[in-house]
Amino acid sequence: MKRTYLAVLALALTACGAPAAPAEDEFSLPTAAAYFTTACPEAGTKPATDKELTYWSMWTKDEPQGKVLRYAADCFTRKTGVKVTIQWLGRGYLRQNLLPALNTGTVPDLFDQDLTTVKAAIVSAGGTRALDDVLSLRTGDGTVRDVLPAAYRDTSAIKDDAGRLFAVPYIVMGNAWWYDRKKIPGFTAPTTMDELYALLGDRSVALDGDIGYYAAWYFDQLAARYVGPGGLARAAQDPTGRLWKSDPGFLKAAEHTARIATHLVDGWDAGKFPQIQQRWADGDAAYLFMGSWGPTETREYLAKQGGDQSIDYGSFQFPLPPGATHDVIEVQQIAFGVTAKAKHPEAAKAFIAYFLTRDLLAGMPAVADSLTPRSDLPVPSDLADLKAALEDPAKKHTLFMDGLDGVADGTFAEQVFYPANNDLLRGKLAPAAFVDRLATATAAFWKTQG
């Protein structure tokens, strides 16, 4: 997925419930080619009146995800008679197209995007309608509530301020430390920070430092383990800036982040994405902390290079640092929303339920190498370690960057957090000075917001 997270998506959840019960029959993923030749499943929910719907998508029609969604839309038409008109608008459309349209009569019925961006841009503007009733709709193999684990539907990340569901997910993204199993035989995941530092060795960590979102992940991951889900977002939204200093976890996280910075490859802040990520794929670095799209991007790069080089992807999570008590794992979801002014909300909701049918949603892992919220779908081998971590009941789900990147519609991260974090990684700020700067810059930022 490409990049600055939506800005990373435009450039590539605080509760964890038990996974949904698996389907009774064992299911194997089809090949990418076979997926598009499988029979369309029956629709568990058919609109009583709507005969059409308009869908604005964050994907392009030629992307694997777009191809899967187009196929599902065609199947939906065959099984329900509802015509689906799709506009393939790309990653930035939410703010460029949908947000300006909210005050007009020209809005789609259905749209999709990551939760952070939807909440910051569309929910905050009153542009969505509640989707709690979708949970009771039938997919082709159970209700939506049956097939979606609570971890992906019963969290603050996917609910508005009134506690209403504003979106329904169909793709799950995580992040992890990635390595090549072929190059590190007998690998054992670190269980302490000292073990992690020993593992990282000398200048072995790849980072495209020109992407502020990527560079922020080290501090973000560590801080979340000290202050818990919601802690980063609260500090970012504190108009006094004092929370950065009153909770000692932020300073401890900064100290570990500064130490990780000593393991970054030379030139990490001098390249242009994806140069450093490609160096990792070429074997110039041993480890890469990246989202679940990392294997797809690096595999595509190696394929374009030619030759027989390949990566046997393995991954692991950050260990708990000393004194930390929150064993978290970051999650982001791509989800469907229905606009408040939708002319065909019944059809839009029925399509959401239909796409969550196992045989249709299987296209996301089979064709697009993407994780889904359904626990009964097999996953690409590259993502098996990450999927296991996401489903570990001992881990608490938290939103990517705790949603900090969506604060003040993203301007807080761009103006305050990313610059300070980059200076911490470069050694221009000591950990204590970094926390001091966040405190003063946060207070100054909110004074300018009125």
Residue spans for each PLM region:
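Bacterial signal peptide processing site
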Residues: 17-19
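Hinge/lid segment of periplasmic solute-binding proteins
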Residues: 30-47, 118-174
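Short, well-ordered beta-strand elements
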Residues: 49-61, 82-87, 110
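Extracytoplasmic "Venus flytrap"/periplasmic binding protein-like
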Residues: 71, 78-148, 185-188, 279, ...
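C-terminal capping/gating helix-and-loop segments adjacent to ligand/active sites or protein-protein/ligand interfaces
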Residues: 160, 330, 368-378, 388-446
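Extracytoplasmic/periplasmic solute-binding protein
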Residues: 161-170, 175, 195-242, 249, ...
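Extracytoplasmic/periplasmic substrate-recognition and gating elements
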Residues: 185, 262, 303-369, 448
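Glycine-centered hinge/linker elements that transmit conformational signals in sensory
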Residues: 237-269
